[in-house]
Structure formats: C-alpha cells, structure tokens
C-alpha cells in the first residue's frame, strides 16, 4: 500500500498513467468488523434530528438571468395547419386572384364546358379541363397553385374525395406518377406534386405558379378529373367542389376561388338540362314572392271600402246597379271562343233594346211555331205498298 500511495502521489500525467496501468495491483480483501468493534462508533450516531434553516433565496431567480423560453418544434415554424373543413368562399386577396374558363357551347360533342349561371364545370372522365389563372399583381417568387376537391353537402364534407375502387384497380389512366386514389390531376406539368394532408388525409395537387407569357394576361393549368360523379364506391352521385388557391412557398394563402364539378358522359346535355331547371326554379320563386304581395294589396283595398249598410242592400235589389254602365275588358284566347262570346254579348245588347211586350210576343210566336212543327211530325208518313208474289195488281 505504501508503494501504491507513493506512485499515486506522483504528479499525474500521460507518462505516469502508463506506469499505473502496467502495475499489478493486488486487491486487499477488507473484512467487515465484528459487532464488538462497532462500540466505539456510537459517537457517530445522530442523537438529535438534523435542523437546517430554510433559505428562501435558493428559489429566487435573479433579474439578470433570462426567463426560460418554451421549445419550438420544426412543425410550428412550417406551413400553417390545414383546416378540417376547408373554406369555399371566394377570396381574391391583395393580388386580385381570379379564375377564367374557355367559352363553349352545350353541344353533345363537347368534352368540357363551364356554366357561368351555375358556376359549374361539366367534363368527361380524364379529359383536359383548362383553367385560366389571372392576377392583378405578380405573386412573390416560389408561389404555388393548389387544387383540392371536397364534397358540397354538409353531410358529406368530412369525407375525403377519392376515386372509386374500379378506376383505381384498372391499368387505364394510371400510367403516370400520380397516386391512383387522387381524383384531381395535372396534365402536361412534370413539376406537379401530389400531397396528402397528415391530419385530414385530403388529397391535393400543387404546381408552381408561372407568370403569363408575353402578350397574355393569364396562366393556364390543365386539370383532369379521373372518376365519374356516378361511380359507386367513389363520389356516388354526391356533388363536389374544387377549390383553387394561390399560396406562397411557406403555405400562406394569397387568393382562393371555388366552383362545382360534375364528371359525366355528356357534359353539354347535362349543362343544358340544369340551366333549364334553374330558370324554372327562379320563375317559380318569383311567382311565390309576387303572389303574397297581390293578396296583401287586395286585402288592403277591401278593407278601405266602406261597410255595406243593411238598409241600402234592399234598395239595390229593386233598383238597377250603378255599375251597369261601366265597361269591362275580357281577354279571350282563340278566335272561335271570341266569336261565340261576341254573339252572346250582341244578343244581350239587343234584348235590352227591345221592349218587354215585344219580346214576350216574339217569344210566344217562336213557341207556337215549335209546337206546330212538333205536332206535324208525329203523324204517319205515306209510303208505297210493297208487292208480294201472291198478290196481283188491279191492271192484271
């Protein structure tokens, strides 16, 4: 132990550590003392409890030390979180973000047509749908255009819009890099990115914003809708809305527009049918609004008239009405009905001009003629007698 203490007392350095490492130290077994040997250690036992005064200054924070700040993860500094129910209201923003569609007719041969009255796009499956993006001021560098599809009705808005299992499993229209479950795709742009939100699982597609070319005021993005609206297991005849947003590279919203989409076999026919139904609905709504107003006016007019007196009603029965000389206009549809009613009117006018005595004489004369004519037709008619073989005429 003396040699070990002598070596340990040497100044510690890299060379002395090597000497200590090479030394073969013999471990000395230390036996615990017997119980009798603990008698001298009674003085080390605590006869009284430890009394320590509490120092409140230990928990005081000096004013010079900065307060601890909460840790911020990388998710907090990234793009803003996506809402569970995306907003569909239009928001042009400070840049005047707008959407335009090419003018097209309602012919049966068209593959894509837009109705301004309905704010609805009708297109066929996997056909090109050009959408023009217009801004009043250029967005910051790195801006992107996002397309997101959601269900229109509140009862279905929480569901994610996906393709039906049939169109996902077939090899047709599934050759590109886009995931098979995404409904909205971008055509002719290799820089498109297909996203799936980690919280809502909604599908969207992003393309970098491209400034308009020389001589043009809009940027065109070609979209495809890869499933019919009537597909079972997919949209299942549920109407959908497509939301187009202009965002910065960090995800800040710059503008938003939305429109309804119907994917069908004959876009022109369906657009024409829905526009006709919209006009009928508007006419019906207008009629229902005007009818109560007319009823209110009529009730007010009747209320403004004086109440009839019981004594005056007896006089009006004996005397002619005051309004007999008033002229009324009757609109009649059809010339035959007009001629018939005109004859009735002429006969009534003549009956008023003829005196009552002459009218009775004429009526009696017509009645006697009718009776005489009827009595004349009751008698037997004279006919020639038919000859029979056995009978002979007088000449024979």
UniProtKB/Swiss-Prot annotation:
GO terms for biological process: apoptotic process; DNA damage response; negative regulation of apoptotic process; positive regulation of transcription by RNA polymerase II; protein tetramerization. GO terms for molecular function: DNA-binding transcription factor activity, RNA polymerase II-specific; metal ion binding; molecular condensate scaffold activity; promoter-specific chromatin binding; RNA polymerase II cis-regulatory region sequence-specific DNA binding. PROSITE patterns: P53. It is found in: Cytoplasm; Nucleus. One of its GO terms (cellular component) is nucleus. Binds 1 zinc ion per subunit. Its cofactor is Zn(2+). The keyword Cell membrane does not apply. InterPro entries: p53-like_TF_DNA-bd_sf, p53/RUNT-type_TF_DNA-bd_sf, p53_DNA-bd, p53_tetramer_sf, p53_tetrameristn, p53_transactivation_domain, p53_tumour_suppressor. Residues 77-89 have a biased composition (Low complexity). Zn(2+) binds at residues 164, 167, 227, 231. Its main location: cytoplasm. Residues 262-269 are annotated as: Interaction with DNA. The keyword Zinc applies. Binds DNA as a homotetramer. Multifunctional transcription factor that induces cell cycle arrest, DNA repair or apoptosis upon binding to its target DNA sequence. Acts as a tumor suppressor in many tumor types; induces growth arrest or apoptosis depending on the physiological circumstances and cell type. Negatively regulates cell division by controlling expression of a set of genes required for this process. One of the activated genes is an inhibitor of cyclin-dependent kinases. Apoptosis induction seems to be mediated either by stimulation of BAX and FAS antigen expression, or by repression of Bcl-2 expression. This is Cellular tumor antigen p53. It comes from Oncorhynchus mykiss. The lineage of its organism: Eukaryota, Metazoa, Chordata, Craniata, Vertebrata. The gene is tp53.
């Amino acid at each position: 132990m003396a040699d070990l203490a002598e070596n340990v007392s040497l100044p510690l350095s890299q060379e002395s550590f090597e000497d200590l490492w090479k030394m073969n130290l013999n471990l000395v077994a230390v036996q615990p003392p017997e119980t009798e040997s603990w008698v001298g250690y009674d003085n080390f036992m605590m006869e009284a409890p430890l009394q320590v005064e509490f120092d409140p200054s230990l928990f005081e924070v000096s004013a010079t030390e900065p307060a601890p700040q909460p840790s911020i993860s990388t998710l907090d500094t990234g793009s803003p979180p996506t809402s569970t129910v995306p907003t569909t209201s239009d928001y042009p923003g400070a840049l005047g973000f707008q959407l335009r569609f090419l003018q097209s007719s309602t012919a049966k041969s068209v593959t894509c047509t837009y109705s301004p009255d309905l704010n609805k796009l009708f297109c066929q499956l996997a056909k090109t749908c050009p959408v023009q993006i217009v801004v009043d001021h250029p967005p910051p560098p790195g801006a992107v255009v996002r397309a997101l599809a959601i269900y229109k009705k509140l009862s279905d808005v929480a569901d994610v819009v996906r393709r039906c299992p049939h169109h996902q499993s077939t090899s047709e229209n599934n050759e590109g890099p886009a995931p098979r479950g995404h409904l909205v795709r971008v055509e002719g742009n290799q820089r498109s990115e297909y996203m799936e939100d980690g919280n809502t699982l909604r599908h969207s597609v992003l393309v970098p914003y491209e400034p308009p070319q020389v001589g043009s005021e809009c940027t065109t993005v070609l979209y495809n809708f890869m499933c019919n609206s009537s597909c079972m297991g997919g949209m299942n005849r549920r109407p959908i809305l497509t939301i187009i947003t202009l965002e910065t590279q960090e995800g800040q919203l710059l503008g938003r527009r939305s429109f309804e989409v119907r994917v069908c076999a004959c876009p022109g026919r369906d657009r024409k049918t829905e526009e006709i139904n919209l006009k009928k609905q508007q006419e019906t709504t207008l009629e229902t609004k005007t009818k109560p107003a007319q009823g209110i006016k009529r009730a007010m007019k009747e209320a403004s008239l004086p109440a009839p007196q019981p004594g005056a009603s007896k006089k009006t029965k004996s005397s002619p009405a005051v309004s007999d000389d008033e002229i009324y206009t009757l609109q009649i549809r059809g010339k035959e009905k007009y001629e018939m009613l005109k004859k009735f009117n002429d006969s009534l006018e003549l009956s008023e001009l003829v005196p009552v005595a002459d009218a009775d004489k004429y009526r009696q004369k017509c009645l006697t003629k009718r009776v005489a004519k009827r009595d004349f037709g009751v008698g037997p008619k004279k006919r020639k007698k038919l000859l029979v073989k056995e009978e002979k005429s007088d000449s024979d």
